Amino acid sequence: MSERVLIDGYNRRVDYLRMSVTDRCDFRCVYCMAEDMQFLPRQRVLTLEEIYQLAQSFVALGTRKIRLTGGEPLIRPGVVGLCKQIAALPGLRELCLTTNGSQLGKLASPLFDAGVKRLNVSLDSLDAERFKQMTRTGDLAQVIDGIDAARAAGFTRTKLNCVVMQGRNDHEINDLVQFAIERDLDISFIEEMPLGIISEHSRAESFFSSTQVRERIAERYTLIDSAESTHGPSRYWRLAEAPHIRLGFISPHSHNFCGTCNRVRLTVEGRLLLCLGNEHSVDLKAVLRAHPGQPERLEKAIIEAMKLKPYRHNFEVNDDVQVVRFMNMTGG
């Protein structure tokens, strides 16, 4: 039998799924959500079994990489068991997870044993007070302990994700690179994404491009362009002074990666988002609940949904919000 694959209307193969397991988070990062964020009632959220069933259908259709996200995925009860189920799906090559690191101290080893291959950990500052300001509730020491616990558990190629904001943490770029070098971690610098209406700061004023980040790094290190890929949006560079780590740049504004987009997102409400920067979506939860025990109905809906995937997003570097859902509702 020939391999089943998902192809969108622009002949791009879609084999990477980002699945949100919760919209809830123990942080309130200023670029991600409002401080008084109202979370979804439980009846609107997919059950763990439904998340697993959706993962089964996507893998049956050729998905090779799944990343679990949130909110903060590790605060959802039962998430380690879910990881073990998904990691065991025949045909899935890689199960990854993005976390703020707050729960890794106790969950890194169970996640590794469950079959999670790689972790991305958000870290925007190495200054405890600034970290608290940017996350509103976060404890820097707890996150660093979690990163060290992940290394001790056996995780390799753990990656730090840093959202760079002008006047907030841009002066810490090289300190974060040095932190990554010392702990043998990859690191990606991310341009702030205009999702959700915020009042805490002006996105136009806080924008700091990937080019500016590279220029800042080049003041201390020698950058070497790399053709490496992790099947995601990061474009990688190496450092002559520390060739064992990778530096990634995720640049939705300045160098968008739409032309080679291979991914879709599933919200914890069961909506399949065809693009991070558009509202095109399909309600897979409705299909799943209307046709229990009929995976073929779900797979048909997924295949049809690929026709709705746009060629590119519509992000702009200003304060005009094209997408009103916050990042935690999208699946970060």
From Swiss-Prot:
SUPFAM superfamilies: Radical SAM enzymes. PROSITE patterns: MOAA_NIFB_PQQE, RADICAL_SAM. Pfam families: Fer4_12 (PF13353), Mob_synth_C (PF06463), Radical_SAM (PF04055). Its EC number is 4.1.99.22. The keyword Nucleotidyltransferase does not apply. [4Fe-4S] cluster 2 binds at residues 258, 261, 275. Binds 2 [4Fe-4S] clusters. Binds 1 [4Fe-4S] cluster coordinated with 3 cysteines and an exchangeable S-adenosyl-L-methionine and 1 [4Fe-4S] cluster coordinated with 3 cysteines and the GTP-derived substrate. InterPro entries: Aldolase_TIM, Elp3/MiaA/NifB-like_rSAM, MoaA, MoaA_NifB_PqqE_Fe-S-bd_CS, MoaA_twitch, MoCo_biosynth_MoaA/MoaC, rSAM. Transmembrane segments: none annotated. SMART domains: Elp3. S-adenosyl-L-methionine binds at residues 31, 71, 122, 193. Keywords: 4Fe-4S, GTP-binding, Iron, Iron-sulfur, Lyase, Metal-binding, Molybdenum cofactor biosynthesis, Nucleotide-binding, S-adenosyl-L-methionine. Monomer and homodimer. HAMAP family: MoaA_B (MF_01225_B). NCBIfam families: moaA (TIGR02666). Catalyzes the cyclization of GTP to (8S)-3',8-cyclo-7,8-dihydroguanosine 5'-triphosphate. This is GTP 3',8-cyclase. The gene is moaA.
